[in-house]
């Protein structure tokens, strides 16, 4: 964002001891005391600075008045849709901080049309106060040459044929349905799961252990290696019950990898006609659709082509421009 507005000065607040490289900016630590410091002391400091606008990219405002027009970005509202997906109900946040932030912000950014609809339904604010700003995709996610891919496959010890899942291992991601569908596939490729253990994952881990050979779990993957993993996959499977946006399908499409997603939340919106959409709750549908993509080279080629074109419509520079539009709107009223 700072690149788009070189005439603007930024004050970035974050954890003590952290360093964020943002041009035209200064860095200041958020007070250490979690509640009183962040919601009372911090707003007082902001008011003293007299900023033209306050931007909360994590979806919340301090409870204290910041003394300027404000914009927040809401990434998803999964905990409101199904609290059982999470280890705790976070009552202070879900009942007070987040609702108050959404109601007070001059402009609320939603990362998808689906998230915008959720904001209206859950909090009752007018749709006119919401601006949709989709996520972007980094240029590093792109088709790679065969030589580079061969080296990456050997270095990362990836199988010759595999279906890919990218995401935290947690209930909301619905990995269990994918595991059931994959286990039923005929002549199935391997399944590579890239992502850390999240929460409430014990039943998922037990199922993964029972499936044995052919299932690979990669934790702590260097982010620089992720484009190569996408490129090497025969297909990305993203069966999530809920996403505010859904970056892995977009990243996979940018790499030219066919994508199969669930029909839930924002995922059909992100892939549009460039991916296949499957019933999130049906292992049989996942099996059948993945077998189609693996076995039909013409279909896979068409999905690769459509995916690259679809992903080209998303960029972080576009996201920055739209975010600035939201901030300008908040400032000018």
Could you tell me what each predicted segment is?
Residues 1-333:
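Carbohydrate transferase catalytic cores enriched for Leloir-type hexosyltransferases
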């Amino acid at each position: 964002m700072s690149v788009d507005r070189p005439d603007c000065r930024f004050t970035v607040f974050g954890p003590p001891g952290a360093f964020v490289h943002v041009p035209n900016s200064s860095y200041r630590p958020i007070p250490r005391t979690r509640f009183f410091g962040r919601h009372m002391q911090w707003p007082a400091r902001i008011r003293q600075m007299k900023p033209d606008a306050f931007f909360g990219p994590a979806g919340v405002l301090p409870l204290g008045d910041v003394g300027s027009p404000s914009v927040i970005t809401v990434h998803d509202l999964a905990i409101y849709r199904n609290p059982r997906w999470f280890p705790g109900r976070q009552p202070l946040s879900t009942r007070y901080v987040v609702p108050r932030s959404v109601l007070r912000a001059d402009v609320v950014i939603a990362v998808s049309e689906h998230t915008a609809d959720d904001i209206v339904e859950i909090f009752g604010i007018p749709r006119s106060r919401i601006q949709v700003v989709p996520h972007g995709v980094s240029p590093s996610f792109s088709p790679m040459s065969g030589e580079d891919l061969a080296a990456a496959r050997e270095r990362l010890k990836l199988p010759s044929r595999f279906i890919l899942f990218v995401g935290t291992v947690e209930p909301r991601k619905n990995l269990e349905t994918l595991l059931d569908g994959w286990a039923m596939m005929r002549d199935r490729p391997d399944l590579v799961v890239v992502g850390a253990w999240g929460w409430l994952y014990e039943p998922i881990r037990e199922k993964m252990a029972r499936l044995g050979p052919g299932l690979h779990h990669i934790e702590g993957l260097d982010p620089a290696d992720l484009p190569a993993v996408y490129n090497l996959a025969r297909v990305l499977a993203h069966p999530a019950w809920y996403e505010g946006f859904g970056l892995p399908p977009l990243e996979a499409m940018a790499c030219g990898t066919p994508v199969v997603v669930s029909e839930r939340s924002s995922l059909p919106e992100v892939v549009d006609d460039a991916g296949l959409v499957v019933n999130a709750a049906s292992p049989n549908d996942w099996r059948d659709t993945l077998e189609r993509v693996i076995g039909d080279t013409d279909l896979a080629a068409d999905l690769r082509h459509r995916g690259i074109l679809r992903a080209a419509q998303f960029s972080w520079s576009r996201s920055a421009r739209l975010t600035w539009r939201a901030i300008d709107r908040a400032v000018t009223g």
